[in-house]
């Protein structure tokens, strides 16, 4: 697995983590390992900090990592490490901000369990804190299996400090006794020279029901693949469109040339009317529709998930009328199916809804 591609690069990522995350919880309490005093010390370490932009055993437990769709451009090898750019010195790491469930979340405790683990793995404040051993210790302190850290390597690193925040968390599937939580993450890392690198990834976290809380069984980081040198016009247009807000893995999916033009053109059409917050495109999604043996459209580059439009979260019941209208608009841009919080045609073939799709819109395409 290509580590560089797992930690997808976004040169245009905002300087402040969470700037495009209106649903991420407000900071409630700083972990003792990274309090405000520690952050101030990190800001002046090495002179001052700078800000860098870099951007179960069954088939159903696997996460999308597939080849390009038929007819897609060929790809070039990935660079050995993420590219970076350095801003002026003097900016500290953003403060940790634990995920807090908003209105309308289905079984928020399930998401919270998955996200606590990822935040713990990807946040540290001292030299060696990004090592496998140190991250495993943080999971152990939470009462979780420390071996899970071995599956979350994109969040580890040699830097002396890092902060990981949740941009969005949606279900890849939620059943009575099992679940898939798709966590879209931003991560800042403070390097030894006092510079901050901004990057991120998406992780598919698998859980099973247990007492007193759900238990994590696996973590599957996104693996978008290398960027192509022959990206089509629709892909270039999506990447350049300021009204399409892409997380790191989704941006890398598009840059790889592994997303069908029908999906990209639909996103552009939606962006004429809304500011579109994308959560998932291809990588980081279960290969099979959760709980079934049916291949998902996502790993084939034939689907896109959206968690907010014009800053309005799909999951929030207060936005229901707006979301229903948006689902109808989405159906007009070419998908064969639109999933969301409401089944607008009562069992017809265009719309569908279930517990999994209360927190995002899903647009699936035949080609």
Language-model features: locations:
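Second-shell loop/turn segments in exported
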Residues: 100-105, 248-258, 290-293, 310-318
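N-terminal secretory signal peptides
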Residues: 1-38, 43-52
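Exposed beta-sheet edge and beta->alpha loop/turn motif
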Residues: 176-221, 226
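N-terminal low-complexity, Pro/Thr-rich disordered segments
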Residues: 54-108, 233-234
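A short, amphipathic edge element
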Residues: 154-171
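Core segments of small alpha/beta cavity-forming domains
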Residues: 93-157, 254-258
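Extended, low-complexity, intrinsically disordered C-terminal regulatory tails
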Residues: 259-292
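Catalytic cores and adjacent binding grooves of peptidoglycan-active enzymes
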Residues: 206-237, 253, 265, 277, ...
């Amino acid at each position: 697995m290509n580590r560089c591609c797992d930690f997808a690069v976004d040169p245009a990522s905002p300087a402040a983590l969470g700037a495009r995350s209106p649903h991420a919880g407000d900071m409630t309490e700083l972990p003792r390992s990274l309090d405000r005093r520690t952050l101030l010390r990190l800001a002046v370490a090495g002179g001052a900090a700078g800000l860098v932009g870099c951007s179960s055993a069954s088939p159903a437990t696997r996460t999308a990592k597939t080849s390009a769709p038929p007819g897609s451009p060929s790809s070039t090898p990935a660079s050995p490490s993420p590219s970076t750019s350095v801003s002026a010195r003097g900016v500290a790491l953003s403060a940790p901000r634990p995920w807090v469930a908003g209105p309308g979340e289905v079984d928020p405790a399930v998401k919270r369990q998955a996200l606590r683990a990822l935040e713990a793995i990807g946040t540290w404040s001292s030299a060696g804190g990004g090592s496998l051993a140190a991250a495993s210790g943080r999971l152990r302190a939470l009462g979780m299996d420390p071996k899970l850290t071995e599956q979350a390597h994109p969040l580890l690193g040699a830097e002396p400090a890092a902060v990981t925040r949740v941009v969005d968390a949606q279900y890849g599937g939620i059943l009575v006794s099992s679940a898939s939580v798709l966590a879209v993450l931003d991560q800042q890392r403070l390097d030894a020279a006092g510079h901050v690198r901004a990057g991120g990834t998406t992780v598919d976290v698998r859980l099973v029901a247990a007492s007193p809380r759900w238990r994590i069984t696996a973590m599957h980081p996104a693996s978008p693949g290398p960027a192509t040198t022959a990206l089509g016009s629709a892909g270039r247009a999506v990447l350049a469109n300021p009204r399409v807000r892409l997380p790191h893995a989704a941006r890398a999916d598009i840059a790889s040339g592994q997303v069908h033009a029908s999906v990209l053109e639909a996103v552009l059409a939606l962006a004429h009317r809304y500011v579109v917050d994308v959560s998932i495109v291809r990588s980081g999604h279960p290969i099979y529709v959760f709980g079934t043996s049916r291949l998902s459209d996502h790993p084939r580059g034939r689907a896109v998930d959206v968690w907010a439009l014009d800053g309005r979260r799909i999951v929030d019941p207060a936005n229901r009328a707006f979301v229903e209208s948006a689902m109808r608009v989405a159906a007009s841009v070419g998908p064969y199916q639109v999933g969301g919080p409401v089944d607008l045609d009562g069992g017809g073939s265009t719309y569908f809804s279930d517990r999994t799709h209360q927190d995002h819109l899903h647009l699936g395409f035949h080609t």
